[in-house]
Each structure stands twice: as structure tokens, then as C-alpha cells.
Amino acid sequence: MDCRLYRKGLIVCVAFLSQHLGYAQNGPNWRDSLTAINKQIAESAWSTDLHLRKAAYNMELKQWQYAVDEYALVLRREPRNPAALFYRAYANTHLRRFDLSRNDLNDLLAIVPTHFEARLSLSVVLQQLGRKQEALDMLNQTIQLHQDSAVAYAARANLERQLKQDEVALYDWQRAEQLAPRDPTYVVSHVDLLLVLGRHREAQRVLDAAVKRGIPRGMLAEWYEKTKHQK
């Protein structure tokens, strides 16, 4: 686990933080659910909830275009529907339509300016579009609005590392650790950067502090070994 996971996986993580389905199913069960909800839609008057649920099933089955089409139906009737804007942006990222994702996320933020997941998602989309400074500006604003979010600091640290702003990235990893002291992900990302910079003793101190905070030493064993080999 290192900070590169944020760039690759952040959209996936934040998109399902507020997922309107609260239970787990396997593929065949999702298909059964999709069949059932299609029947409900065919037999019922218009229901935004039914169409949002259908789109969610499409996404669980990785039917991204079907999901996009379903959210479009909702947005024709309710252009300011936050869930439809957010999840259509998410589906479009899987289709690599990053401009469309950006448009939906900007529209959502015009409606809900503090929407945390939308802000993080937009920062990732901007990076995919090669607009890293805009992405950094978005993360700076997000941290101002959500100063107690370890995830926001970690996302900014990852981008700062890509931009070779290593010292400020180290600060942000430290803040992420302070806000989520028992999360090993932030620890190993912090240590990984220290090792890249050749600061092996400092990396070991970070590991020792994490163990004192209650993170099992075994979870960090690989990183302890790396500090030994690189001294």
C-alpha cells in the first residue's frame, strides 16, 4: 500500500462512500435484481428512486453506458439531482470520458459546494486531464472546507509527490497520520517517501511511532525490513 493507490483508486473509493445500496450481492443476484427492477419500472409511473436503483445495479454489473443512460433519464427530469450527477460522473470515468465527468462534478459543486466526494473525484479527473495545478487548487480548497479529513490530506500528498513537492507532501502525510493515527496506509505512504528521499532513520522513527499508537508491528514488518536494508 502506498500513495499511488490514491490516484488509481480514489474515484472508486469515494464513489461508493454514499452508495445508495447497503448490501452485498454476487453477479447473478445483481442480474436478478436488475430484471426485477426493469419489471417494476415498466409497470409503474415515473419513479426517480427506481431509476437510480436501476443505474446502481448497472454499475455493479459494470454496465457503465447503461448506467450513464439511466442517470441521463433522471437528469432530464431533475437537472439538479445530486446523486445522478455524481454517479454519472463516476460511470463516465470508467468510459474514460473525463471531460464529461468534470462537467457533471462541476455542476454538482455548483449545487452543493462542500460535497466532499465530488471535490476529491474532481481532483482525480483533473489529473487525468493533465490539469494538475487545477487539481491541487481543488484539494487546497477541499482541505480548507474539511480540515479534519485524513483522506483529503493524503490525496493532496499524493499529488504533491507527483509534482516533486516532497517536503509539503511529507507534511500532508504527517497530518493524515495525526487525523487517522491507527490507519497504516498513511504510515507506509509517509515511510515510502522518506525512503525514496534517503531519510531512513526518520522512516524508522515514523514506524516506531505508529507501533506505539497501536498499529500492529507485523503490519509494518515489510517496511521495517526496507529501513534496515537501506541504512
Locate predicted features:
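Terminal, low-structured helical/coil segments at or just beyond the last alpha-helical repeat
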Residues: 28, 196-231
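Helix-start (N-cap) detector for alpha-helical repeat units in TPR-like alpha-solenoids
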Residues: 48-49, 82-83, 116-117, 150-151, ...
